[in-house]
Swiss-Prot record:
GO cellular component: mitochondrial inner membrane; respiratory chain complex IV
Disordered as annotated region, ranges: 32-55
Name recorded for this polypeptide: Cytochrome c oxidase subunit 4 isoform 1, mitochondrial
Membrane-related topology note: Single-pass membrane protein
Record note on quaternary structure: Component of the cytochrome c oxidase (complex IV, CIV), a multisubunit enzyme composed of 14 subunits. The complex is composed of a catalytic core of 3 subunits MT-CO1, MT-CO2 and MT-CO3, encoded in the mitochondrial DNA, and 11 supernumerary subunits COX4I, COX5A, COX5B, COX6A, COX6B, COX6C, COX7A, COX7B, COX7C, COX8 and NDUFA4, which are encoded in the nuclear genome.
InterPro entries, per database record: Cyt_c_oxidase_su4_fam (IPR004203), Cyt_c_oxidase_su4_sf (IPR036639)
In-chain residues carrying the UniProt-annotated modification N6-succinyllysine: 4, 35
Pfam families referenced in this protein's UniProt entry, alphabetically: COX4
Taxonomic classification: Eukaryota, Metazoa, Chordata, Craniata, Vertebrata
Role of this protein: Component of the cytochrome c oxidase, the last enzyme in the mitochondrial electron transport chain which drives oxidative phosphorylation. The respiratory chain contains 3 multisubunit complexes succinate dehydrogenase (complex II, CII), ubiquinol-cytochrome c oxidoreductase (cytochrome b-c1 complex, complex III, CIII) and cytochrome c oxidase (complex IV, CIV), that cooperate to transfer electrons derived from NADH and succinate to molecular oxygen, creating an electrochemical gradient over the inner membrane that drives transmembrane transport and the ATP synthase.
Record keywords, A-Z: Acetylation, Membrane, Mitochondrion, Mitochondrion inner membrane, Phosphoprotein, Transmembrane, Transmembrane helix
Length: 55
């Protein structure tokens, strides 16, 4: 059988309680709505709705 090796060029994500906000994104492949929200986040956050801020 073939063993798939990790891509060590990308930082690995480890969920740790002592370091709660790592630099690595939790989702590698964003949906269309998530991408739209990311673009909207680049502008002023005061324009975001409460639901968008929680998302």
């Amino acid at each position: 059988s073939v063993v798939k090796s990790e891509d060590y060029a990308r930082p690995s994500y480890v969920d740790r309680r002592d370091y709660p906000l790592p630099d690595v994104a939790h989702v590698r492949h964003l949906s269309a709505s998530q991408k739209a929200l990311k673009e909207k986040e680049k502008a002023s956050w005061s324009s975001l709705s409460m639901d968008e801020k929680v998302e």
